[in-house]
């Protein structure tokens, strides 16, 4: 627990619908991450898999709540994915229930846009299944959607 010159990133898994507010991501972080650790964290990110835990229109609110909880750190979506083979059983769809390309594009545009639209944004999300999604698994390439969102083109 010593400060270094390296950027220190903490990633928390976004999970929807905990039994009650005391078990939410934010309650957990407040309870389990002491100030001595918080002061060492440069960036707090969320791991987001909307197929399992949808964020939808709450993306800005969730990121704002994370920002308030970690006010001395920058906020990011540090992990993002949709439609990976181990996620296909997820109960939620985003953008399209039947077209994985449209669904991934919608996820990339919405969540990346919400993350990068913040004044204190720290980079674009890391698309977890990038290689698989880019080289032709069901759902096609994700790079064009990510590039368009990150450059605004």
What are these regions (language model features)?
Residues 10-14, 25-57, 62-63, 73-86:
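Aromatic- and acid-rich polysaccharide-binding/catalytic face
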């Amino acid at each position: 627990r010593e400060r270094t010159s390296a950027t220190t990133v903490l990633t928390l898994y976004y999970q929807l619908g905990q039994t009650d507010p005391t078990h939410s991501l934010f309650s957990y972080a407040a309870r389990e991450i002491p100030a001595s650790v918080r002061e060492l964290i440069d960036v707090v990110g969320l791991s987001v898999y909307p197929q399992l835990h949808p964020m939808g229109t709450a993306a800005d609110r969730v990121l704002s709540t994370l920002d308030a909880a970690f006010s001395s750190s920058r906020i990011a979506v540090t992990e993002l994915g949709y439609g990976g083979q181990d996620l296909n059983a997820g109960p939620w769809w985003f953008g399209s229930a039947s077209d994985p390309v449209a669904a991934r594009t919608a996820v990339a545009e919405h969540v990346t846009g919400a993350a990068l639209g913040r004044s204190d944004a720290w980079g674009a999300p890391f698309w977890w299944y990038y290689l698989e999604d880019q080289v032709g698994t069901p759902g096609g390439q994700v790079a064009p959607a990510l590039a368009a969102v990150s450059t605004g083109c």
